[in-house]
Amino acid sequence: MELCTRSTTIITHLPASFNGHGYLAGKSVDRISLPLQRNVASLVLQSRTLRCSRKFPGETVTEETSTGVNEFGVEDRDGVVVAAEEKNSNSEAPQAEDEETQALEFLNDIKLDSDKTYSILLYGSGAIVALYLTSAIVSSLEAIPLFPKLMEVVGLGYTLWFTTRYLLFKRNREELKTKVSEIKKQVLGSDSE
């Protein structure tokens, strides 16, 4: 009994109209062998596979088992060799204990005031609820058929307006630069203070 056998179907003869058309620089092709699986011709084209479930007219089909080289150029083997690795459980146990003690020491070092803990939990839960509500609103607005397209048109219109207002001419670019610097001073404060 063989462990690794392979059953392949080989086309040994194609119709005479296919042979000798001069596709291979004038040399006639007498015999073409294609590996098939259960009378289904398969040709691999980059990312797609073409399959033909019917037999070619005038073909002769033979079935044979093979234990030699398969269609990928890899030799089939009769047995499987598995190498078992021995793990040294004694050296892994202290490492796991060290990691656990480091994690516990880190958690013991964290000290939270009760006043700050409540405010942090309140802000965190409020942020999670706000994120959930925002995603629900956005998904409901996307369900309206015309709304996303309308928002795209509004965005393109604003982009065109901003470009013509501030970026097209030099005096307008300088005006934008002064407005940005004023806003920076308001937010960050002036350097002289």
Curated annotation (Swiss-Prot):
Subcellular locations according to the entry: Plastid, Chloroplast thylakoid membrane
Major location (coarse): plastid
Chain ranges passing through the membrane: 118-138, 143-163
Record keywords: Chloroplast, Membrane, Plastid, Thylakoid, Transit peptide, Transmembrane, Transmembrane helix
Recorded coiled-coil stretches: none
Annotated organelle transit peptide span: 1-51
A UniProt-annotated Pfam family: CAAD
Complex formation: Homo- and heterodimers and trimers.
PANTHER family: PROTEIN CURVATURE THYLAKOID 1D, CHLOROPLASTIC, PTHR33222
Protein name per the record: Protein CURVATURE THYLAKOID 1D, chloroplastic
Species per Swiss-Prot/TrEMBL record: Arabidopsis thaliana
Gene that produces this protein: CURT1D
